[in-house]
């Protein structure tokens, strides 16, 4: 770190370089599991309807539902089951995988180091609705041209992609918190018709990229460094070094928003009525 507290301070990062010796191949792999540290537990349908009724009565208004209906919600009768929206959309755990393959070695004239890496993260959303993939490479070569002149070539690159639903992660999570636990995912439990929710869109529809749309982010990064270092003869410790650096960065974003409908089911008509989401 040079001049960290100054306006033009710089942080110098040195990447791994090859060492003299026979070629060595190394493979590293890591698998990880991620899970939320804490997810607030929401009221179930029985608790929600009980509190909703009490709130109306305490405000001097008629009960929200009749006693018979409340009993059905409390007992979880057919058609009155509690719906866990978070469980319908999110997995309890997500997996991560990372691997790196490297090769290094060298002689008294040439040393080299190269690596290729891959990492993936499936996130917590069900149906692989959100995925992240990253590819990296690194190549460092040092060549002793003469006794006093050394050349080095350092290359590094990264390519990563994120595929996700059109709806942002926060909106999906919010939908599982805001909507009541009394509305089922599908109208009349028919998977061909996403149920219409009163507050924010149906979270199960939100993660269905084929139904509501998707977004893709792409990052490309290339770092190159070419250097020549010359030791001044007869002056111990005095060196001259020239460096050429070229960096390339490219970011791409593509989103497709599909018009979609959610539905309500008429118990008496047996018909599904569409509502624009």
Which residue stretches match the model-derived regions?
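N-terminal catalytic cores of large hydrolase enzymes
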Residues: 190, 201-203, 218
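Residues embedded in well-ordered regular secondary structure
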Residues: 9-10, 17-128
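Extracytoplasmic loops and strand-loop junctions of Gram-negative outer membrane beta-barrel proteins
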Residues: 81-87, 121-124, 203-213, 277
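A surface-exposed, glycine/aromatic-enriched loop/edge motif typical of exported proteins
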Residues: 37-67, 158-198, 250-277
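Active-site-adjacent bridging/hinge elements
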Residues: 74-79, 111-117, 194-204, 274-277
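Short structured motifs
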Residues: 98-100, 210, 225-227
């Amino acid at each position: 770190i040079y001049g960290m507290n100054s306006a033009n301070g710089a942080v110098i990062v040195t990447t791994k370089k090859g060492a003299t010796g026979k070629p060595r191949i190394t493979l590293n792999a890591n698998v990880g599991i991620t899970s939320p540290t804490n997810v607030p537990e929401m009221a179930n349908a029985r608790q929600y309807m009980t509190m909703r009724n009490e709130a109306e009565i305490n405000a001097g208004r008629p009960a929200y539902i009749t006693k018979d209906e409340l009993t059905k919600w409390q007992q979880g009768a057919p058609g009155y089951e509690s719906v866990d929206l978070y469980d319908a959309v999110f997995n309890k755990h997500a997996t991560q995988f990372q691997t790196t393959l490297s090769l290094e070695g060298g002689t008294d004239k040439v040393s080299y180091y190269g690596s290729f890496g891959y990492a993936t993260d499936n996130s917590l959303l069900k149906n692989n609705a959100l995925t992240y993939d990253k590819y990296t490479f690194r190549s460092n070569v040092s060549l002793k041209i003469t006794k006093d002149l050394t050349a080095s070539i350092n290359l590094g690159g990264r390519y990563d992609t994120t595929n996700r639903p059109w709806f942002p992660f926060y909106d999906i999570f919010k939908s599982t918190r805001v909507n009541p636990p009394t509305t089922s995912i599908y109208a009349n439990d028919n998977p061909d018709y996403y149920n219409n929710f009163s507050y924010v869109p149906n979270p199960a529809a939100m993660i269905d990229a084929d139904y509501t749309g998707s977004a893709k982010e792409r990052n490309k990064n290339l770092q190159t460094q070419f250097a020549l270092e010359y030791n001044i003869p007869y002056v111990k410790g005095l060196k001259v070094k020239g460096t050429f650096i070229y960096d390339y960065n490219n970011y791409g974003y593509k989103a497709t928003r599909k018009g979609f409908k959610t539905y309500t089911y008429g118990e008496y008509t047996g018909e599904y009525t569409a509502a624009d989401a």
